[in-house]
C-alpha cells in the first residue's frame, strides 16, 4: 500500500491525479489531496505520505516552504514537484530539498502514470533494500 498526497490549488488537477491513480493503481494506492500549502503540511502530519506531488504556487505558504516543513517530521517522503513555473530558482530550491523530479504543467495522464510508477519503484527499494554484499558474493 502506498500513501500518496497531492497538493495543488486547482481542483481539476487534484481530481485528475486522484482519477488517474485510482484507475491505474487501484487499491495499491491511497490518495489524499490538499489545496493550500498549510493544508498539505497539516495533512502530511496525520496521513504520513510515502509520495507527495506538490505544486509550487498555492495560497498561504508555497510548495517549497511546505516541503521544508514536511521534511521536519517526514524525512523519507518522496517529493515530485508539479508546476507551471519552470523558473531556475524554483527548480534549484526543489533540488536542494531532494525532489525526485520537477514536472511542468500541463501534465498528461501518461506523465502522471510514469511519475507514480517511478515513485512506487523508489519506495519499494526503500522498503526492501537489496543487500549488495549478498549480490556480490554470488
Language-model segments: what does each one mean?
Residues 1-132:
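Alpha-helical/coil-rich non-catalytic "connector" segments in signaling and regulatory proteins
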Residues 133-138:
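Conserved small/polar residues in nucleotide/adenosyl-binding loops
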Amino acid at each position: 500500500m502506498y500513501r500518496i498526497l497531492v497538493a495543488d490549488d486547482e481542483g481539476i488537477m487534484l481530481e485528475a491525479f486522484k482519477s488517474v491513480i485510482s484507475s491505474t493503481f487501484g487499491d495499491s494506492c491511497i490518495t489524499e489531496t490538499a489545496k493550500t500549502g498549510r493544508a498539505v503540511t497539516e495533512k502530511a502530519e496525520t496521513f504520513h505520505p510515502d509520495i507527495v506531488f506538490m505544486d509550487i504556487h498555492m495560497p498561504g505558504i508555497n510548495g517549497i516552504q511546505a516541503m521544508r516543513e514536511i521534511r521536519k517530521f517526514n524525512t523519507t517522503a518522496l517529493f515530485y514537484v508539479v508546476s507551471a513555473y519552470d523558473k531556475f530558482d524554483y527548480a534549484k530550491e526543489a533540488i536542494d530539498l531532494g525532489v525526485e523530479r520537477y514536472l511542468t504543467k500541463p501534465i498528461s495522464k501518461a506523465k502522471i502514470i510514469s511519475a507514480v510508477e517511478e515513485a512506487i519503484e523508489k519506495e519499494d527499494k526503500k522498503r526492501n533494500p537489496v543487500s549488495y554484499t549478498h549480490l556480490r558474493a554470488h
